[in-house]
Structures are given as structure tokens and as C-alpha cells.
Amino acid sequence: MSKFRDPLHVKVLDDGKHYEVLQTFTYYLYSNKEALLKVEQGFITDFASVPRVFWSIYPPFGRYTKCAVLHDRLCVAFLNKELWNDVAVDKDKLPVVLQNRFIRRYEADQLFLESMKAIKVNAFTRCVLYACVRVYAIFKYGFKA
């Protein structure tokens, strides 16, 4: 079963909109109980990138905050053409199909959804947030993203 292994420790940056991860935290990948993905100390996030007009319904932080930070890290990896190996604690424990392969935006979005389910974010919220990231990705990068 997927789960986060560590607490999330952050500090607010001077701009008041971004946060720095103070301690590396990890997430067990769904398909392999030994495979851990990491968000490194020093990573900068904005939590959930929700337009301000919707903050009363879905604020940038909430039960899904760790999921949003993991998603941000995977999206940065996608944009920088990083391999799954780069976000794994131990690349040899990754499923073979992910080893030495670039992260796809679709996979980052799927893990966002999976991680929200793992920490029991309610189904409606999961669907709304997942739909939002998919629509954004399709408009920004096309259907192959």
C-alpha cells in the first residue's frame, strides 16, 4: 500500500507564496512496497497551485499538502527531463519498467491521485484536484503529456 513515510517540514519563504522543504521526505510507491520516492531537502514548492478565487473551497494546503509537494517534485522532474532514478531513494528497488526512464507528466498526475487516495483524501476532492492537474497538463503540453 502506498504511503508517506516521513512528516513534511517546511519554512515559508520571504515572498509568502513558496515554501522550502527542510527535511527530505519519502513516499512508498504503489507497485512496490520497497520503492521509495523522495522530495529532497531544499526543494521549493507552492503546495497546491489553486487559483486564489477557489481558495475558500480548495486552499493551497490541506490534507493533500504532501501529495501536492510530491506532485510538484515530479512535475519539476518532468520539465527537467529527469529519470525516475533521480527521484528514487534506491533506483534498484524501482519497478523495472520505471528504471532508467524519463518521468512523464501523466505519471506525475497519476501519483498525485494515488497518493491522495493513500492518505484518504475524500473521493470528490481527489477527482476535482486530479481533473484540474490533467486539464492543465493537456492544455500546456498536449494530450501526450
Question: Could you say what each language-model-derived stretch is?
Answer:
Residues 1-145:
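Extended terminal accessory/targeting regions
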